[in-house]
């Protein structure tokens, strides 16, 4: 079953999400690069998003949602995901945060507007990225920020090794990462959707301060606004 023609929901079982969660814990507690990524997003939004609501789309295990809620407050930050099992799990673990299940009518029926929406390691899973991004733009307020983070892989799928092995055991012979983004290819899709990059950060696995292309990069984070809402951004302090 597909959600809004964008992703195959059967891939993202609770066990799959727990594999992702284990990687996040390893990247936060041992390698530290995941913590750097989360901190960078939080710091940028603290300086640029004002006091408006924040929605974490593709929240998975809820780690970023919870991290942001500690910075902004649980009444400000919400999470959303296509996996109902993950949403139910997150609601029990983080009971002060609102979590929404993304069903086939979510983007048409969800009435709230957000000062910022985060889309962390989601776009590479989406079959039709441009229509997907256009749906998300509708949820932004007039000056809203869309944060997009995508893996920086040497070979497509090398940062989703365990997820791909898990899928092989399930008889799914499809790379969970449908494309490998560079800055230019990501910018092309964002531009087609009506978004303009305001600021970007390469998240390096070994060097927090690095912001250049490298074989040791883990992710590329871009901070965007709809084309009608352009203004000079304030770079984060860390």
Feature-to-residue mapping (PLM):
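Conserved N-terminal segment of class I S-adenosyl-L-methionine
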Residues: 1-111, 116, 120, 133, ...
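Short, motif-level signal for alpha-helix interfacial/capping segments enriched in acidic residues
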Residues: 59-60, 160-162, 192
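Short catalytic micro-motifs in class I SAM-dependent methyltransferases
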Residues: 121-125
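Serine-hydrolase catalytic-loop signature spanning alpha/beta hydrolases and amidase-signature enzymes
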Residues: 128
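A short glycine-rich, Lys/Arg-flanked "PGG" loop and its adjoining helix->strand segment in the class I
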Residues: 131-142
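Conserved class I S-adenosyl-L-methionine
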Residues: 147-168
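Acceptor-substrate binding/catalytic loop of class I
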Residues: 169-185
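A SAM-dependent methyltransferase catalytic signature shared across enzymes that methylate proteins
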Residues: 184-202
